Amino acid sequence: MRIMLLGSPGSGKGTQAKYLTERFGIPQISTGDMLRAAVREGTPLGMEAKKIMDAGQLVSDSIILGLIKERIAAPDCANGFLLDGFPRTIVQADALAELGVTLDHVVEIAVDDEEIVRRLSGRRVHPASGRTYHVVFNPPKVEGRDDETGEPLVQREDDKEETIRRRLEIYHVQTKPLVDYYRSKAAQGGVKFHTVPGVGSVEAIRDAVLASLA
């Protein structure tokens, strides 16, 4: 089964991806992991990517596509895979299709922006230990203080509301159009497209995702 998950930052894609890969015995293909592995192994594409990254530039779509093509030819992808973090744009989706990479299911985990902001902006961290809290879902015993040390908790830059809204804006401009793209492909019979509400318990969302893939 070849699956791709779509959803905004904070929609719970990562949690569901982990479950699906275990459930179906398929690897999660993450572009970040692939790049790091290719650089570490010193493959030709990895060396090319390293030069670009060392210069502080973004790795081109053509290199990422080359890595994906190599990765899905590996034996552990014989029964399928789950794509993570690619494609992010319609140009990338078209390039993936031209490469001959077909998908069986595209699942959108839909959560509205205000819920995402509430989820992410409520996170607090104890820097020394890495312990995490949430002001609503997992609050510390004393507001703003770590349970074990009593030291102050901090809000990471990534979890500040303005940062989250910027990330959501980028998602809506670049990646959200893929929902219509794959919905249109599904109408032509090319792939099955499903939208699953990403609210409720992790288990309820998992069951809804599984039901959509049945």
From Swiss-Prot:
Pathway: Purine metabolism; AMP biosynthesis via salvage pathway; AMP from ADP: step 1/1. Residues 122-159 are annotated as: LID. One of its GO terms (molecular function) is ATP binding. AMP binds at residues 31, 36, 57-59, 85-88, 92, 156, 167. PANTHER family: NUCLEOTIDE KINASE. Residues 30-59 are annotated as: NMP. GO terms for biological process: AMP salvage. This is Adenylate kinase. Catalyzes the reversible transfer of the terminal phosphate group between ATP and AMP. Plays an important role in cellular energy homeostasis and in adenine nucleotide metabolism. Consists of three domains, a large central CORE domain and two small peripheral domains, NMPbind and LID, which undergo movements during catalysis. The LID domain closes over the site of phosphoryl transfer upon ATP binding. Assembling and dissambling the active center during each catalytic cycle provides an effective means to prevent ATP hydrolysis. Belongs to the adenylate kinase family. ATP binds at residues 10-15, 123, 132-133, 200. It comes from Methylococcus capsulatus (strain ATCC 33009 / NCIMB 11132 / Bath). Keywords: ATP-binding, Cytoplasm, Kinase, Nucleotide biosynthesis, Nucleotide-binding, Transferase. It is found in: Cytoplasm. PROSITE patterns: ADENYLATE_KINASE (PS00113). Its EC number is 2.7.4.3. Gene3D superfamilies: P-loop containing nucleotide triphosphate hydrolases (3.40.50.300). It is an enzyme of class 2 (transferase). One of its GO terms (cellular component) is cytoplasm. It catalyses: AMP + ATP = 2 ADP.
